[in-house]
A protein has these predicted regions:
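The feature encodes the CheY-like receiver
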Residues: 18, 60, 88, 178
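The short loop immediately C-terminal to the conserved phospho-acceptor aspartate in CheY-like receiver
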Residues: 14, 51, 57-58, 65, ...
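Active-site residues of response regulator receiver
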Residues: 56, 84, 174
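Acidic catalytic/metal-coordinating carboxylates
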Residues: 37-40, 63-66, 155, 181-184
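Alpha4 helix (beta4-alpha4-beta5 surface) of REC/receiver domains from two-component response regulators
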Residues: 66, 73, 87-102, 184, ...
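Acidic, metal-coordinating helix/loop segments flanking the phosphotransfer/catalytic sites
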Residues: 34-52, 73, 152-170
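Two-component/phosphorelay signaling modules centered on CheY-like receiver
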Residues: 15-33, 133-151
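Hydrophobic/aromatic residues positioned on beta-strands within the core alpha/beta folds
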Residues: 83, 201-203
């Protein structure tokens, strides 16, 4: 089986719905796993990355929104599409607050759902490597609102586990991490996923000046300083996410 194929998780307590979605998505070339409840879905997510999760809103025990909040803790880059017989009104608002990308009514319009899956997979994937959970949460909200998929890592170990994802377009790397350092993570990016673009970030401009200069000389694409100039950060990400490495690096400040 081709491990580079997009992976989809379908979670619904209706067995026939799961079977139909699994058959359709598999025929389209996706790798598909199925779970019929929240705990089973979380067990799958603990051992495997999913690009998109299709989640039933109402299920016995853990509902789809509670499930997605837990999925985000394990796999922030997974995009959620919620399906429900109660679409609209407060359901849509609650889903958006939980971070779900789209809400679809049941019975499912399969062509529309397939279009949304394709659209979700086309969103550039950005990995934020920073030990500050509040910054990561804010970046997740900011970038998701602008159409990026956003994965998160808080240290070198967590980053290393995600760097091999071939969908990865840009990695934002904090220069100070609790284990390892940003320079080491940058070099891992170049070794493990050389097509990904790399932006170093730091709130310690003077202290990190020499290290930043060295990393830029090694080929990092840009540096952004904290507190972020948000328009500049977004412009940098927009430029880099549309490129693949090999087009020439530019240090943007």
């Amino acid at each position: 089986m081709n491990d580079t194929l997009p992976t989809i998780l379908v979670v619904d307590d209706e067995i026939d719905t799961c079977r139909n979605l699994q058959d359709i998505l598999a025929d389209l070339g996706y790798r598909v796993d199925v779970a019929h409840d929240g705990p089973s879905a979380l067990e799958l997510v603990r051992h495997k990355h999913y690009d998109v999760a299709l989640l039933d809103y109402l299920m016995p025990g853990m509902d789809g929104l509670t499930l997605y909040r837990e999925i985000k803790k394990l796999s922030a880059g997974t995009v959620a599409i919620v399906v429900t017989a109660y679409a609209g009104g407060t359901t849509t608002e609650e889903a958006q607050k939980a971070g779900a990308w789209q809400v679809l009514p049941k019975p499912v319009d399969f062509p529309k759902l397939m279009g949304l899956v394709d659209e979700a997979l086309g969103q550039p994937l950005v990995l934020v490597v920073d030990d500050d959970p509040d910054l990561c949460a804010n970046m997740w909200d900011l970038l998701r609102d602008r159409g990026y998929r956003v994965a998160v890592a808080h240290d070198e170990r967590e980053a290393t586990a995600q760097l091999a994802n071939e969908a990865l377009r840009v990695v934002l790397i904090d220069m100070k991490l609790p284990t390892g350092d940003g320079a080491k993570v940058y070099r891992l990016v170049r070794r493990v996923n050389p097509k990904a673009r790399a932006v170093v970030i730091t709130g310690h401009r003077s202290e990190m000046e020499e290290k930043v200069r060295q990393i830029l000389a090694e080929g990092a694409d840009a540096v952004c300083y904290k507190p972020f100039d948000v328009p500049n950060l977004l412009d940098t990400l927009a430029r880099l996410s549309g490129e693949r490495n090999g087009d020439g690096a530019e240090g943007a400040r």
